[in-house]
Amino acid sequence: MFPWNGSRLGVALLALGLELSVIPATVLAVDLDAGTQRDIRAATFEVVQLKPPDGAVTYERPLPLDLIPYQQRVDLYRSIGTAFAIGPNKYVTAAHVLAAGAASQYGPPALRDAAGNVYPIYQVLQYSQHEDFAVLSLQNPPHHVQVLKAGPKPALNDVVFAVGNALGEGVVIRDGVFTSESPEEFEGKWNFLRFTAAASPGNSGGPLVNRRGQLLGVVLRKSPSENLNYALAIDQVMTARPGEGRISARASVRLPIMDIAETREYDEHFALPLELSEFYKTWLAVIEKENERDYTELLAHNESHVFPHGAGAEKLLHTIESSPLPQRMHEAQNHIWVVDGAKSQNVQLEHNGFVDFTSDMVRLHAPDDVDLATLYGDSKLQMDLFLKAYTLRRMVGTDSVRVTSLGKAKTEETFTDVYGRNWQIKAWAIPNDDAMLIVLSLPTPEGYCGSYFRIPTGFSHMATQQQKRLLDFVFVTMQGSLGRWQSYLTLKGIQPKIFDALSIDVEGHQQVNFRSARFDVSVTPNLLKLSDGSIMRLNFAFLHGADTVVWDVAGIWVAEGPHSQNSVVVWREAEPTSDLPDGFQDRWRKMRNRDFPFNATVASENSETRIATTTLPPGGPSGVKVVYGLRVVAEGTQPQDAMKQKLDLLQRSVKQLEH
């Protein structure tokens, strides 16, 4: 559910997957004598991780664990791959198998022999991400371990054997033939071995051997388009530079908000050996550094049309709309920036609460019995409410069980975006899936809104950094009941920086006073019947400031209640640039000249009556760049005189401070 194209992160995430798929096959090994099979099995180990406890996770019903195969159910470890011995305390596996342990919620990878003995990994001696191999040593290696010796390069159609663990059920040997070689993807610097011997999940990192039990390669992955598997020739391991770690990749770097891409390459080297924990720190640091550099450069290379720069931004800089559910801004055709909110799902909660959400955006309207201070400070409560709407399930055999709670967040931080909006970033652990569910939320007077995503644990930090970058491209307005607004305004440190320049006085059923550097407005009972349940929305928008674009209040809407049509609205209209569509030009001319519907004449539609005007007299003074629209809406069909009186009162209550 990462709401962006994979690019560099996608390349990194590949390292977390066991790349082999199941190929139905019979376990044959018919050409291997018993002694050779015994030696191969003695030299081959499972790569395992200790399973984590569920911790604070709760479910809607007991887990049907009996649906899990017995061996997997009772095993304290999960099998993630295979390794084999090539020398005294020297073991080889696939690089992507080792990478699965990076920042994992499972225990660090270890090797397990056929007797069930588990040997912690001590050091990483060699590592190559592109060639996909790693050489390891163990803390307390087994005595007199069997070692596989390299054999000659196989001839076409030679019988070969793929060796690997069967997901905790022991080492399995499958036969096939060597079919061909395939050049590596970048420059064709070496050839992978391709073979037909079937391989299953868990075989990654295992040995490919000939009928004499001699080592030919490291089993890596299945061909995406045919029933063939790939292995790295063992010569690539044996001739690799000792004491070196190498992370190299070629990938397309993209942003989900723009139709831009660059092909990036990197080739980073670091010294080995390193103890396993230090290796992971170094490995993640290299990948995160490259990721940060690539996206920084991608934005810099396209700065001329990245919002808010360029003519394509003007449409959005003249857009004011209600958006309590956040919308991601994105660049459409011809570099025009727009907000196109995806269709959302709405789930009702108890006590008038609800959750509105898309695949990556969320709006929580807190239940009446949940006060805002508690919501912002209690991460368990925040996620529990979200999980009443967002379906998170745990697969158990052929069944799946819904998660009802993830407990408290494992990490919490705050982040202020370029527009001064203070986001709360919280990450909840999903131990069984080795994943994190991360919410970047902006506290609002009704609860919170923001974005969310789910990511493998090892890449949660890097993914969060990317999501922070995208917060600058979130379009959102803020609304809530007057009672909630009173609570929200007392909670310091959570409000966006722009609130320092605003004066908002909410006096329950008495009046609402709003003042900014741009306009003032007062709403009193003579204009609108007010109560603690009345709704006020501040329509924030991106506006041209003195020397930069700012996020500021561009309008205010107040309604008698959440389901009432009786309301007043004041909004800002800036003179459009000449290249904006005719609709912008036409609305500006009508507002400047007070043409219909801004001529203080009633119009009825959809069971309501509207009347509107502007803060300027007809024609207005020359050189005016900003005008404010004023509208009164009433339920049913209302007479002109009564509506005009309300509009006059609103006009006297509004003062435009900018021109």
Short names for language-model regions:
Residues K149-V171:
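Short glycine/Trp-rich loop-beta-loop segment that forms part of the substrate-binding cleft
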Residues D31-Q37, Q123-V124, H144-V145, A166, ...:
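C-terminal cap/linker of serine protease catalytic domains
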Residues V74-P141, A155-L156, M361-T374:
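Catalytic-histidine neighborhood of serine endopeptidases
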Residues V27-F84, Y91-A94, R254-S322:
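N-terminal activation segment of mature serine protease catalytic domains
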Residues S248, A342-V347, P445-V506, P525-L527, ...:
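Surface-exposed amphipathic alpha-helical segments
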Residues E331-M395, R515-D579:
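Secretory pathway targeting signatures of secreted, lumenal, and periplasmic proteins
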Residues A43, E60-D75, V118, S137-V147, ...:
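Active-site region of chymotrypsin-like
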Residues L385-C449, S567-D641, E658-H659:
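Signature of long, low-cysteine stretches enriched in small and polar/charged residues
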